[in-house]
A protein has these predicted regions:
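Amphipathic alpha-helical interaction segments
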Residues: 27-28, 39, 52, 122, ...
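Short, P/G- and charge-enriched loop/turn segments at secondary-structure junctions
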Residues: 43-48, 77
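Acyl-donor (CoA/ACP) binding surface of acyl/acetyltransferases
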Residues: 1-22, 56, 63-175
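A short helix-loop-beta-strand connector motif used in the catalytic cores of GNAT acetyltransferases and
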Residues: 46-58
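Conserved GNAT-fold acetyl-CoA-binding loop/helix
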Residues: 24-45
Length: 175
């Protein structure tokens, strides 16, 4: 089944709030606790969840059902604007995991960010135990760079993360 990324619509907000507040829907590698009430709607009113420093797009299947969302946020590797990169992420609902949607959605997000921003570098990180996401990133054209020790605090403890990157000039993936 094919998919596309699209901007979040006002009609999606109730569903996104339920997803983001549901530990089961987020999965054990994406659950970081509850967000303040109303935060999603405040961000939507501010910039439609498509800001210059962070944003979200929904993953929509060809039948119109939503499978999850992808996100990006700016990270800086120096004080100047040219040192900005984006870290990307994905959250798929349990029923849509294991079907190749993660690789395709992250490939599309990379293409979108390279087409509409001036960033040279995209990054993604995932738990060292999340081998499904590691495979998805590699299929989406990302290169494994490093293991970041105790880089993420979640579920009462620190977790090692695998860092991936994709540069503007890297050969596109063949998802």
């Amino acid at each position: 089944m094919t998919l596309r990324l699209r901007p979040v619509r006002r009609a999606d907000l109730d569903m996104l709030e339920r997803w983001w507040a549901d530990p089961e829907a987020q999965g054990r590698h994406n659950w970081f606790g509850f967000a303040p009430d109303g935060e999603l709607r405040r961000r939507f009113e501010q910039d439609g969840l498509l800001g210059p420093e962070r944003g979200n797009l929904v993953v929509e299947l060809e039948d119109g059902n939503l499978a999850g969302d992808v996100s990006y946020y700016a990270v800086y590797h120096g004080p100047n604007p040219g040192s900005r990169a984006f870290n990307i992420g994905i959250a798929l609902l349990p029923a849509h995991r294991g079907h190749g949607h993660g690789a395709e959605a992250q490939r599309q997000l990379a293409a979108y960010l390279f087409a509409h921003t001036r960033v040279e570098r995209l990054e993604a990180s995932t738990d060292v135990e999340n081998t499904a996401e590691q495979r998805a990133l590699e299929r989406a054209g990302f290169t494994r760079e490093a293991v970041l020790r105790h880089a993420q605090y979640r579920d009462g403890g620190f977790h090692d993360m695998v860092l991936y990157s994709r540069l503007r000039g890297d050969r596109p993936s063949q998802v």
